[in-house]
């Protein structure tokens, strides 16, 4: 089964199996097919996939890099670019990213910059990558530890979403992606919020429910990205929870997984929305807490403590460190005017005169963060 269910801002197909030669019909066998992945995916998932692609007559070039956020760097990027040159890859080639969000970010940035742009296909293998990272054409790498400081907008020619890959993941890894879905519910689609409340763990055991869930989330992301492909206004609502999350990831030097950082980031940012008077319904904070807890997602910085190396822990003792790191967020117009997404009510972000980002009062930001940091320092 191949279901072409999204065409804007780019094609997305929902497939039962990657082992279908019809999927590859638009990729010429006259030029190399370059697979970008990480070493973990290459070992656990790729062998049968590579065997199938090879049987179709492609000259396959596999380029991998070590897994993890700490390896989404300029140095790895340049190394991969050099390997493309060493293999004689030219404009007619296709780059295919197979993996989670980090792999897809790297593959997209490589494809957009090599020869000023070569054909790109994406095959996400994690929940986060399926419902978020693979949709919309954003890519990027970190620079000096700062999240996605370098990147482009480069839509793939096609994305193939195959839920079968999720069987290779632990339940915890599935839940990393659930945080992005909760975000979709908060900023744009209250139906997703109700869906998660209603089905809960059934999501992990029913393929029918899972398929509906994945498609709905992909469609939400696609609709928003199509309306604002270059992330100038409306698309910024998808950064809810990510302003704080990226600061936490930076300070931990990649040791806090993105999905867990986003979960905590959403709780902190929704509290800031409430304290700022933008969100009027305090019960939404409790609802977010309960929904996150249903999927074993953290809601406080203290819950992330065990993931942070001991020699980095002091960075989370004082709110000033987080606030300083927030100054480097790419949404900011300057490092003195911090901006983040504020929730007005469930399914709606405060429009803020069309920017969809607000600058919280420093006193409110400080006090909310201080409460989080005090818990880390004192426990």
UniProtKB/Swiss-Prot annotation:
Its EC number is 4.2.3.4. Zn(2+) binds at residues 180, 242, 258. GO terms for molecular function: 3-dehydroquinate synthase activity; metal ion binding; nucleotide binding. Keywords: Amino-acid biosynthesis, Aromatic amino acid biosynthesis, Cobalt, Cytoplasm, Lyase, Metal-binding, NAD, Nucleotide-binding, Zinc. Its main location: cytoplasm. NAD(+) binds at residues 67-72, 101-105, 125-126, 138, 147. This is 3-dehydroquinate synthase. It comes from Chlamydia felis (strain Fe/C-56). The lineage of its organism: Bacteria, Pseudomonadati, Chlamydiota, Chlamydiia, Chlamydiales. The gene is aroB.
């Amino acid at each position: 089964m191949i279901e072409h269910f999204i065409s804007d801002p780019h094609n997305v197909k929902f497939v039962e199996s990657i082992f279908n030669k019809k999927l590859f019909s638009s990729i010429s066998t006259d030029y190399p097919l370059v697979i970008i992945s990480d070493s973990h995916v290459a070992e656990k998932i790729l062998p049968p996939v590579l065997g199938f692609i090879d049987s179709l007559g492609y000259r396959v070039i596999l380029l991998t890099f070590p897994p993890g956020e700490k390896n989404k760097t300029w140095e790895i990027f340049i190394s991969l670019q050099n390997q493309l040159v060493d293999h004689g890859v030219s404009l007619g080639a296709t780059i295919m990213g197979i993996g989670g969000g980090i792999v897809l970010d790297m593959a997209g940035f490589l494809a957009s910059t090599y020869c000023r742009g070569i054909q790109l296909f994406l095959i996400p293998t994690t929940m986060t990558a399926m419902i978020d990272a693979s949709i919309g054409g954003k890519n990027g790498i970190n620079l000096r530890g700062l999240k996605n400081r370098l990147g482009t907008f480069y839509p793939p020619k096609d994305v193939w979403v195959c839920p079968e890959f999720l069987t290779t993941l632990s339940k915890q890894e599935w839940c990393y992606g659930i945080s992005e879905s909760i975000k979709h519910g908060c900023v744009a689609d209250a139906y997703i919020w109700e869906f998660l409340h209603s089905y809960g763990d059934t999501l992990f055991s029913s393929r029918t429910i899972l398929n509906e869930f994945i498609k709905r989330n992909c469609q939400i992301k696609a609709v928003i990205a199509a309306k604002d492909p270059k992330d100038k206004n409306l698309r910024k609502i998808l950064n809810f929870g990510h302003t704080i999350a990226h600061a936490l990831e930076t300070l931990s030097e990649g040791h806090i997984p993105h999905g867990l950082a986003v979960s905590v980031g959403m709780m902190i940012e929704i509290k800031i929305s409430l304290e700022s008077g933008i969100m009027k319904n305090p019960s939404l904070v409790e609802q977010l807490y309960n929904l996150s807890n249903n999927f074993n997602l953290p809601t406080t910085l203290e819950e992330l403590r065990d993931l942070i190396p001991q020699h980095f822990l002091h960075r989370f003792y004082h709110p000033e460190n987080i606030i300083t790191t927030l100054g480097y967020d790419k949404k900011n117009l300057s490092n003195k005017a911090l901006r983040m997404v504020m929730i007005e009510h469930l399914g709606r972000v405060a429009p803020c005169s069309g920017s969809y980002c607000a600058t919280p009062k420093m006193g409110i930001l400080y006090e909310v963060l201080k409460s989080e940091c005090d818990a880390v320092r004192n426990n």
